[in-house]
Curated annotation (Swiss-Prot):
GO biological process entries: cholesterol biosynthetic process; farnesyl diphosphate biosynthetic process
Pfam (any one): polyprenyl_synt
Family recorded in the similarity comment: Belongs to the FPP/GGPP synthase family.
Cofactor(s) named in the record: Mg(2+)
Protein name according to UniProt: Farnesyl pyrophosphate synthase 2
Superkingdom in the source lineage: Eukaryota
Broad class of where this protein is predominantly found: cytoplasm
InterPro entries: FPS1-like, Isoprenoid_synthase_dom_sf, Polyprenyl_synt, Polyprenyl_synt_CS
Gene, per the UniProt record: FPPS2
UniProt-annotated location(s): Cytoplasm; Nucleus
DNA-binding found in the keyword field: no
Source species: Cannabis sativa (Hemp)
Length: 341
């Protein structure tokens, strides 16, 4: 059985445990609601974050075959990250008034769900400590795991806040957009939970103290930033069929890497055009912004950024004293370098 199928098996086991949690007396209706909500929101993505906990742990263990227990526990931690992601996305979609997610309507758009989705988000968040309690309570690193998830959740919610208050309607001001602001949003909103958390889970399970791995955290945050810049680029220049969504960063007045880069190199004339059309939902405005991006050769600017970042990350990774840790970081970098989706 391949790793992904094994990973899915663990999902069904965890789901079944949550639907029979002794702390709450379920009715048939409530059990059915939670089950549908979980199936709709948790396992639908690429599962990269979750699977990389298993990968990373195996590499840290020198690549030797994992025991059944190790596979189960690393999978359970991987699913905790997927639960965290589901919780963020369900609430995020309500805040952004989004239409689709992973090729289906956002959960709150499903008939009968509506704003019940807000409570479903809270439930998803509360499932994480239930899973951790059931499977890790006896472990020496139990408190470290709770701490780690709490801290990363706080960082992500704070990153989301910066993102939201930066794009408040009626306060649209492009001049406040800069590389430092872009990096701050990305670091907190995406990099901690998508890049640092999976590796941190593997390190904790392997008996490592996270305080000794600040350098690893910094490299992963840089990698997360690089990943988000790719995302910003693909939002505009990627093919919707390939990336699985239609990009709306321009319409949404997002603090995208592209607009920040554009602001650094525009003439006064071009700047006026950008200020006038960025953040407008009409097709003509979006087209004008995209044409400006082409004129400024942001595709070339991105290609330069991509190769420079790649070299810089590789150099940082190779400076790490532990070969296993290097291998974990290199496998992460290989997965995202020059990705198309």
């Amino acid at each position: 059985m391949d790793l992904k199928s094994k990973f899915m098996e663990v999902y069904y086991k965890l789901k079944s445990e949550l639907l029979n949690d002794p702390a709450f007396e379920f009715t048939d209706d409530s059990r059915q609601w939670v089950e549908q909500m979980l199936d709709y929101n948790v396992p639908g993505g690429k599962l990269n974050r979750g699977l990389s906990v298993i990968d990373s742990y195996q590499i840290l263990k020198g690549g030797k075959e994992l025991t059944e227990e190790e596979i189960f526990l690393t999978s359970a931690l991987g699913w905790c990250i997927e639960w965290l992601q589901a919780y963020f996305l369900v609430l995020d979609d309500i805040m952004d008034n989004s239409v689709t997610r992973r090729g289906q309507p956002c959960w709150f758009r499903v008939p009968k769900v509506g704003l019940i989705a807000a409570n479903d988000g809270i439930l998803l968040r509360n499932h994480i400590p239930r899973i951790l309690k059931k499977h890790f309570k006896g472990k020496s690193y139990y408190v470290d795991l709770l701490d780690l998830f709490n801290e990363v959740e706080f960082q992500t919610a704070s990153g989301q806040m910066i993102d939201l208050i930066t794009t408040i309607e009626g306060e649209k001001d492009l001049s406040k957009y800069s590389i430092p602001l872009h990096h701050r949003i990305v670091q907190y909103k995406t990099a901690y939970y998508s890049f640092y958390l999976p590796v941190a889970c593997a390190l904790v399970m392997a008996g490592e103290n996270l305080d000794n791995h600040v350098d690893v955290k910094n490299i992963l945050i840089e990698m997360g930033t690089y990943f988000q810049v790719q995302d910003d680029y693909l939002d505009c220049f990627g093919h919707p069929d390939v990336i699985g969504k239609i990009g709306t960063d321009i319409e949404d007045f997002k603090c995208s890497w592209l607009v920040v880069k554009a602001l650094e190199i525009v003439t006064d004339e071009q700047k006026k055009l950008l200020f006038e059309h960025y953040g407008k939902a009409d097709e003509a405005s979006v087209k004008k912004v995209k044409e400006l991006y082409k004129t400024l050769d942001l595709e070339g600017v991105f290609a330069d950024y991509e190769s420079t970042s790649y070299q810089k990350l590789n150099k940082s990774i190779e400076a790490h004293p532990k070969k296993e840790v290097q291998a974990v970081l290199k496998s992460f970098l290989a997965k995202i370098y020059k990705r198309q989706k």
